[in-house]
């Protein structure tokens, strides 16, 4: 119940600022049983808010001067057919990308390759909790946005928040959010380090 309240609150508040577009993530449904209803559909359907747009399936969705190029996990992140247009083509993707890393240094070798993003002007990605930038075909940029706040001891304290893409200027900026209750990892050589205040924070 608390999670439903939170999702309703955050989507409603975001929709007061601007039209809010979202896609499905790996925690929102059972990939092994697609006959089950996903977690987001009932919430969004009940809100009946025209400014909350849920693109569950893969496809290209025209939204004024933007073409949302949606890669859906429901459809195994297949590349949708991208037609030529004057609109800015922004890919929306959720999944691991080959070559990207986590905060503890794990490198994804078996993730999705970047060739599937050919035709996009920009791609916004979710899944890996570490914020990072990578290149897609056409020398365009893609952004793994990362987690909104630090989730556990395996993540850095800083470099979490959200990103803003300025369509007219073709610029992307990140906004950091401060976690009031961070997970802190300290390194010590002995108990004396704690007693003397010489412990070293290692996951800033």
Residue ranges of model-derived segments:
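Short beta->alpha connector loops
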Residues: 71-77, 148, 193
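Core catalytic region of metal-dependent phosphoesterases/phosphodiesterases
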Residues: 1-59, 116, 120
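Beta-strand-turn-beta hairpins that frame and shape the catalytic cleft
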Residues: 60-70, 84-90, 137-142, 170-171
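Active-site-proximal segments of metal-dependent phosphoesterases and phosphodiesterases across multiple
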Residues: 4, 75-121, 128, 132
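Active-site environment of divalent metal-dependent phosphoester hydrolases
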Residues: 21-34, 61, 76-78, 97-101, ...
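Conserved beta-sheet core of the metallophosphoesterase superfamily
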Residues: 103-169
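Active-site neighborhood of phospho(di)ester-bond hydrolases with catalytic His/Asp-centered motifs
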Residues: 1, 19-26, 54-58, 71, ...
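Binuclear metal-dependent phosphoesterase catalytic core
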Residues: 61, 143-203
């Amino acid at each position: 119940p608390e999670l439903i309240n939170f999702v309703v609150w955050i989507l409603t508040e975001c929709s007061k600022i601007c039209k809010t577009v979202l896609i499905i993530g790996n925690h929102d449904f059972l990939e092994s049983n697609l006959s089950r209803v996903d977690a987001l559909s009932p919430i969004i359907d009940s809100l009946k808010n025209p400014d909350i747009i849920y693109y569950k399936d893969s496809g290209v969705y025209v939204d004024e001067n933007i073409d949302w190029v949606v890669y859906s996990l429901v459809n195994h992140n297949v590349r949708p057919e991208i037609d030529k247009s004057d609109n800015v083509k922004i890919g929306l993707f959720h999944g691991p990308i080959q070559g990207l890393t986590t905060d503890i240094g794990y490198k994804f070798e078996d993730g999705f390759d970047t060739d599937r993003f050919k035709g996009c002007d920009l791609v916004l990605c979710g899944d890996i909790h570490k914020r990072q930038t990578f290149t897609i075909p056409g020398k365009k940029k893609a952004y793994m946005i990362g987690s909104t706040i630090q989730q556990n001891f395996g993540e850095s304290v800083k470099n979490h928040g959200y990103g803003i893409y300025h369509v007219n200027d073709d610029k992307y900026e990140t906004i950091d959010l401060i976690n009031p209750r961070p997970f802190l990892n300290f390194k010590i050589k002995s108990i004396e380090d704690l007693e003397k205040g010489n412990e070293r924070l290692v996951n800033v």
